[in-house]
UniProtKB/Swiss-Prot annotation:
PANTHER family: RIKEN CDNA 6720489N17 GENE-RELATED (PTHR23234:SF10), ZNF44 PROTEIN (PTHR23234). One of its GO terms (biological process) is regulation of transcription by RNA polymerase II. Its main location: nucleus. This is Zinc finger protein 333. One of its GO terms (molecular function) is zinc ion binding.
């Protein structure tokens, strides 16, 4: 076993020194001086590192860029002043009391090397390497470039049965500083052929990675996650500086790009790239570049809010962080670290290969268990599964309506608040959704980007194009579960269902009359305003609806474009053709819920329902007599305006209805 040096038992702080309070700094000072005394009493090299000399004079060590453990060779035992140091018990009690007040946080990163008292067996000369002289007698430090085990300690609340103090081990390479490399050259010159380090296996990035579980990760704030990112990038750079070939893992690319910890679905930590192969020389930035940029932050220059600290010298392009600067340098240089072998597309990070490979190969690894529909991403599968379960997790607190997605709930809340944040810059009309604003703006520009491939007709909305295409294919995918009637659009099915439920959600503010659709309500409002928009060019009749005008125009032209395929009879309106088609099929989709009697037309069902309710909604204004049908009321009114005399031969008959007998005088 080799001799134990001061570096083996030292507690090294890098960026964590600022997180320590005065009690912990004093504890660190006492601990390092105590280790020096212990090593001196065991016959360790009689030299005191410069950082310990400064610890004896002040409570803080050098900064990271200057705080290298340097062996100066100056006698130091006489300079120790233990009476100036506080009691170990007092420091521990004070530190423990402060620990209880600290919240969850990443506050320490120390090298955990067992002290001399904690070793199972004391060091003997037989355990040391077979050397003729101790290493310090040859004028060298006896240190070697070894992998020191580090541990990140995170206090988090208890998760189940787990210990609230969670620790993850990792190995971080302790690089030889410049002064140590000079001593090694001198050592090799004085003792050629002398072994200075034991043989070790190659260390991969997976060996030095610190991994947190998702439960642990959520308890870290932004400062702690930033510290974690810096530690991981430092580990990688240290490995890259000593390894001949080291490919950047996919997870590290995510870490550089987002500053977030990777998850298991992003890839396993590995020292080799997944297919396709990666070029290590292009994937690893130079250590000089890292040192140059890191020195900016070490000097204490803090960017102001909104200021971009890092600049690329080639184009003076500013950057907020280090990682985009490296990526920009590679983009400017035209480098590409990874290349897809099949489609020959190059990517700067190997993780970017995932999406092109899925698109190219059509990989859809997430399949639905119910309909066997597959998706590329798990988030799409979760969203799709809600269509089967009909799960509506997001409830409106005002009206109780439930929605499947939170975005739909947010849009719905605007109907209660009346908020319309999206306003047209030309006409000032406002909308609740940005998509509706985009569609509205096409009315001003006349843009119709959606064109039918069959007939060339263009539309300004994709939904209008889809509905139009179904007129060519004859597809009616939306079918009523009660009567079996099919529709081309889902909105038409929703309107049709109100004929079964008798729901009329749209009510007139002036007279209170309800309607099934908003279109019918808008038409009704014109009765109060007297507005009539559509005028017949032939007879001058003004109509309130465009569809009514089209039907009216056919009375002048005699056009009957709707022909029955069975008997050849033609009709001027599609509704008349549908009613006629039921005479051939015998289909009666409208059934009475009380007696079960079925009818071929909804109007016949409405009239029949009044026989059960004894409702007579049509009342005469003069005699207040009520009728079930409007036609009966019309016939009744003729008795008040006078009798119509129809002569049949010489016998005058007073008739008010063609099916009624003669009325008494």
């Amino acid at each position: 076993m080799e001799s134990v040096t001061f570096e083996d038992v030292a507690v090294e702080f890098i960026q964590e020194w600022a997180l320590l309070d005065s009690a912990r700094r004093s504890l660190c000072k006492y601990r390092m001086l105590d280790q020096c005394r212990t090593l001196a009493s065991r016959g360790t090299p009689p030299c005191k590192p410069s950082c310990v000399s400064q610890l004896g004079q002040r409570a803080e060590p050098k900064a990271t860029e200057r705080g290298i453990l340097r062996a100066t060779g100056v006698a130091w035992e006489s300079q120790l002043k233990p009476e100036e140091l506080p009691s170990m018990q007092d420091l521990l009690e004070e530190a423990s009391s402060r620990d209880m007040q600290m919240g969850p946080g990443l506050f320490l990163r120390m090298q955990l090397v067992p002290s001399i008292e904690e070793r199972e067996t004391p060091l003997t000369r037989e355990d040391r390497p077979a050397l003729q002289e101790p290493p310090w007698s040859l004028g060298c430090t006896g240190l070697k470039a070894a992998m020191q085990i580090q541990r990140v300690v995170i206090p988090v609340p208890t998760l189940g049965h787990r210990n609230p103090w969670v620790a993850r081990d990792s190995a971080v390479p302790a690089r030889d500083p410049a002064w140590l490399q000079e001593d090694k050259v001198e050592e090799e010159a004085m003792a050629p052929g002398l072994p200075t380090a034991c043989s070790q296996e190659p260390v991969t990035f997976a060996d030095v990675a610190v991994v947190f579980t998702p439960e642990e990760w959520v308890f870290l704030d932004s400062t702690q996650r930033s510290l974690y990112r810096d530690v991981m990038l430092e580990n990688y750079r240290n490995l890259a500086s000593v390894a001949d070939q080291l490919c950047k893992p996919n997870a590290l690319s995510y870490l550089e790009e987002r500053g977030e910890q990777w998850t298991t679905d992003r890839g396993v930590l590995s020292d080799t790239c997944a297919e396709p192969q990666c070029q290590p020389q292009e994937a690893i930035p130079s250590q000089d570049t890292f040192t140059e940029i890191l020195s900016i932050d070490v000097k204490g220059e803090q960017p102001q809010p909104g200021e971009k600290l890092y600049k690329y010298n080639e184009l003076e392009k500013p950057f907020n962080s280090i990682e985009p600067l490296f990526q920009y340098q590679r983009i400017h240089a035209g480098e590409a670290s990874c290349e897809c072998q099949e489609i020959r597309n190059s990517f700067f990070q190997s993780a970017h290969l995932i999406v092109p490979e899925k698109i190219r190969s059509g990989d859809k690894s997430y399949a639905c268990n119910k309909c066997e529909k597959s998706f590329r991403y798990s988030s799409d599968l979760i969203r799709h599964e809600k269509t089967h379960t009909a799960e509506k997790c997001f409830d409106c607190q005002e009206c109780g309506q439930a929605f499947k997605y939170s975005s739909n709930l947010r849009r719905h809340m605007r109907t209660h608040t009346g908020e319309k944040p999206f306003e047209c810059s030309q006409c000032g009309k406002t909308f609740t959704r940005n998509f509706n604003l985009i569609l509205h703006q096409r009315n001003h520009t006349g843009e119709k980007p959606y064109e039918c491939k069959d007939c060339g007709k263009a539309f300004n909305q994709p939904s209008s194009l889809r509905s139009h295409v179904r007129t060519h294919t004859g597809e009616k995918p939306f079918e009523c579960s009660q009567c079996g009637k099919a529709f081309r659009e889902h909105s038409s099915l929703k309107t049709h269902l109100r004929t079964h439920t008798r729901e009329k959600p749209y009510e007139c503010n002036q007279c209170g009359k309800p309607f099934r659709t908003s279109t019918h309500l808008n038409v009704h409002k014109r009765i109060h305003t007297g507005e009539k928009l559509y005028e017949c060019a032939t007879c001058g009749q003004v109509l309130s609806r465009l569809s009514t005008l089209k039907s009216h125009m056919r009375t002048h032209t005699g056009e009957k474009p709707y022909v029955c395929q069975e008997c050849g009879r033609a009709f001027s309106e599609p509704s008349s053709l549908r009613k006629h088609a039921r005479t051939h099929s015998g289909k009666k989709p409208y059934a009475c819920q009380e007696c079960g009697r079925a009818f071929g037309q909804s109007s016949h069902l409405i009239v029949h329902v009044r026989t059960h309710s004894a409702g007579r909604p049509y009342q005469c204004n003069q005699c207040e007599k009520a009728f079930r049908h409007s036609s009966s009321l019309t016939v009744h009114k003729r008795t008040h305006v006078g009798r119509e005399t129809i002569r049949n031969g010489s016998l005058p008959l007073s008739m008010s209805h063609p099916y009624c007998g003669p009325l008494a005088n």
